A protein has these predicted regions:
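Internal, non-catalytic "lid/hinge" segments that mediate substrate recognition, gating
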Residues: 116-117, 127-141
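Membrane-interface helix termini and inter-helical loops of multi-pass transporters
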Residues: 2, 78-81, 108-109, 140-152
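Hydrophobic transmembrane alpha-helix segments characteristic of membrane transport
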Residues: 102-110
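Membrane-interface loops
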Residues: 29-46
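Juxtamembrane helix-capping/reentrant segments at transmembrane boundaries
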Residues: 42-56, 111-124, 294, 299
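Alpha-helical transmembrane segments
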Residues: 2-33, 63-101, 132, 137-138, ...
Length: 329
């Protein structure tokens, strides 16, 4: 396919994702307010966040629904092919969105932040990850970790299933942990998906690239409502879906190592939580003022918008490195 035609498809994909999210946001946010689907704010995050109490959650639907509908439209109109890989991605995206939606719904029903228990959520995530692994292997998926230019070829055999499960569950929870400031997780996800869109197209996964361009456009549309001051939060509905599909795209395009670079900010946020727990148990004191890391900066007196801008810039720089790594290495 010519580069110009591919570019046209990519631009169109971003546009329909963006417009779909903007329109749905206009309709959905008032409906969520009417239904009193408001986020309850933890007492531990400080007074700056208390004013956000009651902001509608489940806003992930604003980018999930347009992404699914636009992708189906592109398939029906034969602009992209419904390959097994794309089908798997859609199932993962929808499945993890459902887990998040269920968690958000139960949190609202109980009138606290306790939706699904940690075990329930983890079991559902693992169940979908196992389904992903089954479909991946049935479709002739490789079980080796490969970075061709560096001469890395590690045959993992059955252990690749554990590795895959770790990527999917880990990525979904990493985005979930990062979703603590207005626009933070949404902006970082949009930046990461731009990278995976370009990488997918360049290495021959056109249908995955177009899907991620649609999702990128929808995230830009969502950010109109989620950037500071947020009119809506994505909730677990959005964060779990974003992380899982990011992991799925990395696996299906054989860019698992690239994911570590492109999603470095998410990784750092998650590591800050792990290190904090380790430090508390080992040395009986905190390593950070508060985790995830963005809350540490808040405790240092940084403004919310300044933290988000810093994290976006770091994410953008690392994503550019990730594109180079993902295409040429």
């Amino acid at each position: 396919m010519s580069g110009m035609l591919l570019l046209t498809k990519a631009v169109f994909a971003i546009m329909i994702g963006f417009l779909g999210a903007v329109v749905l946001g206009l309709l959905l946010i008032p409906a969520l307010k009417k239904l009193k689907v408001g986020q309850r704010i933890s007492i531990f995050v400080g007074d700056n966040h208390k004013k956000k109490e009651g902001t509608p959650t489940m806003g992930g639907l604003i980018f999930i629904i347009p992404t699914l509908l636009a992708t189906l439209l592109l398939i029906v109109t034969k602009k992209i092919e419904l390959t097994t890989n794309l089908g798997i991605i859609l199932l993962v995206f929808t499945g993890y969105a459902f887990i998040g939606f269920l968690d958000d719904y139960l949190s609202l029903k109980k009138k606290n932040n306790e939706g699904l228990t940690t075990i329930q959520k983890l079991l559902l995530q693992v169940l979908i990850a196992l389904g992903f692994f089954y479909l991946y292997m049935k479709n002739g998926g490789q079980t080796a970790l490969i970075v061709s230019t560096l001469g890395i070829h590690i045959e993992m055999s059955w252990f690749y299933g554990v590795f895959l499960l770790f990527i999917l569950v880990g990525a979904s929870n990493a985005v979930n942990l990062t979703d603590g400031l207005d626009g933070l997780a949404g902006g970082l996800s949009a930046i990461a998906f731009i990278a995976f869109s370009l990488i997918s197209l360049m290495v021959g996964f056109e249908e995955i690239g177009i899907f991620t361009f649609v999702l990128t456009g929808a995230l830009f549309g969502f950010l109109i409502y989620n950037a500071y001051p947020a009119k809506v939060f994505m909730g677990d509905t959005g964060s779990l879906a974003l992380g899982a599909v990011m992991g799925a795209v990395a696996i299906l395009t054989h860019r698992e190592v690239t994911l570590l670079v492109v999603a470095s900010v998410f990784v750092i946020e998650t590591l800050s939580v792990i290190l904090q727990v380790f430090w508390l148990f080992t040395f009986k004191k905190k390593l950070f003022l508060m985790t995830p890391l963005h809350h540490h900066f808040e405790k240092l007196g940084w403004g919310e918008q300044d933290i988000v801008k810093l994290f976006w810039v770091v994410g953008l720089i690392l994503t550019m490195a990730g594109i180079f790594f993902g295409v040429w290495l």
